Amino acid sequence: MSGLLCGYPMGAKTTSDFLDQGRLSVQEGKYLLAISNHPSPMFVLGYVMAQIALIPSMASPCPLWAVLAALYLPILPISILARCCYHYNRQTREEACPLAAQAAPEKTACFSFDTHMMSCFETMVKIGGYIMLFSILALYLTVFPFQMPPLLRPALLGSVEITTGIQMIASSVPGSMGALLIIGSAAFGGFSGIFQTKSVLKNAGLSIRHYMLWKILHSALSCLIFYVSRYGSLCLLLGVIHLLRRLAFALLRPHNAS
């Protein structure tokens, strides 16, 4: 919930903290990292929708439900797929809980307000620093002297830093293609978000490469769902969701059988 409500990278930070405190097993940490980092609803409602509304030559206004469905529905199939990949289920959680319960008192016996406050300051400085660094890199890409395909430069900007990238996509890519690039960028989180996530994982033993692969998959599914919701019917959108669900369960079934 912290990753969903607070945005990048709070889901990863909460997962890392709980893992360090022994409140989660390693399998739970890997599973939660795959599904807990997302743009917050406030960012989507206040910024993403505002930028989509500014896109020139949009044939029709982009409905809010299509954006929310594209960004948050992929969590369901990715959740099932992550359970399969990391062999996470209720039984393994129950087996890990006694060990976590024994380790937790040793790590959380002493509460220090100063330590927690400094941890918050450190996280804010890291997040702000990476946002500034990658925003500067995005500005360099806008004045890059070499010729690029028309959509490559905006796509690169969105993949570097989502706040700056989304704004530049909205001003340079007309029509529904601009909205599609914005959705893909918001779902991916940008390399700025990846570096922010890496900075808060600390020594939790979680793989940033796995996280990148999950975000790429999430971005692809978000683009697919948004495209279907804009150009297909509601029945087609439900069909795509049902297909993803069946595929995820098909991947999960051999593990359950074993």
Regions found by a protein language model. Name each.
Residues 80-85, 135-147, 240-258:
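Structural signal for alpha-helical transmembrane segments and their membrane-water exit/capping regions
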Residues 51-64, 172-176:
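Helix-coil boundary and interhelical linker segments in multi-pass alpha-helical membrane proteins
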